[in-house]
Amino acid sequence: MSEFVTVARPYAKAAFDFAVENQALDRWQSMLAFSAEVARNEQIAELLSGAIAPIELAKTFIAVCGDQLDEAGQNLIRVMAENGRLLVLPEVLEQFIQLRAALESTVDVDVISASTLNEQQLSKIAAAMEKRLSRKVKLNCKIDKSVMAGVVIRAGDMVIDGSIRSRLERLADVLQS
């Protein structure tokens, strides 16, 4: 997977720079999302890993995408097909999203709790994370009954585990030592 990250980086950066220059971040993210979904399709993935000429592969891929791609998006597909890189489109999308988040100074924060949190709780979490990270945050809330109570907050590689489950596990470790 790390190979895909390395391969996808220049394509994501080129698409991002072009999108910023043309004030088309939403459009490009949409095109990349659609293209990534097409590339994830089993039949298309099989086609991409086959021995089809790059020009034919690009034509087929663009035809499948239809009017979801503008001329610049089609050019990206042609270049990636020529270099045999269409399989990394999902990673190109991920890196594009990360570049956009960095530009907009936002970060995705996963909030995992045992039950649904109310608006007041969510706004307190958002405010605390914005202060801690010095960025705007976008909360992604998930319910996981195994948390029992409390919350687990993930932002990038930072994890704040305030769940009862983790406290019980730590207590069990202390009692066993």
Curated annotation (Swiss-Prot):
The keyword Cell membrane applies. It comes from the Bacteria. Keywords: ATP synthesis, Cell inner membrane, Cell membrane, CF(1), Hydrogen ion transport, Ion transport, Membrane, Transport. GO terms for molecular function: proton-transporting ATP synthase activity, rotational mechanism. It holds the Pfam family OSCP. One of its GO terms (cellular component) is proton-transporting ATP synthase complex. PROSITE patterns: ATPASE_DELTA (PS00389). InterPro entries: ATP_synth_OSCP/delta_N_sf, ATPase_OSCP/d_CS, ATPase_OSCP/dsu. It is a peripheral membrane protein. It is found in: Cell inner membrane. NCBIfam families: ATP_synt_delta, PRK05758.2-2, PRK05758.2-5. Belongs to the ATPase delta chain family. F-type ATPases have 2 components, F(1) - the catalytic core - and F(0) - the membrane proton channel. F(1) has five subunits: alpha(3), beta(3), gamma(1), delta(1), epsilon(1). F(0) has three main subunits: a(1), b(2) and c(10-14). The alpha and beta chains form an alternating ring which encloses part of the gamma chain. F(1) is attached to F(0) by a central stalk formed by the gamma and epsilon chains, while a peripheral stalk is formed by the delta and b chains. F(1)F(0) ATP synthase produces ATP from ADP in the presence of a proton or sodium gradient. F-type ATPases consist of two structural domains, F(1) containing the extramembraneous catalytic core and F(0) containing the membrane proton channel, linked together by a central stalk and a peripheral stalk. During catalysis, ATP synthesis in the catalytic domain of F(1) is coupled via a rotary mechanism of the central stalk subunits to proton translocation. This protein is part of the stalk that links CF(0) to CF(1). It either transmits conformational changes from CF(0) to CF(1) or is implicated in proton conduction. This is ATP synthase subunit delta. It comes from Pectobacterium atrosepticum (strain SCRI 1043 / ATCC BAA-672) (Erwinia carotovora subsp. atroseptica). The gene is atpH.
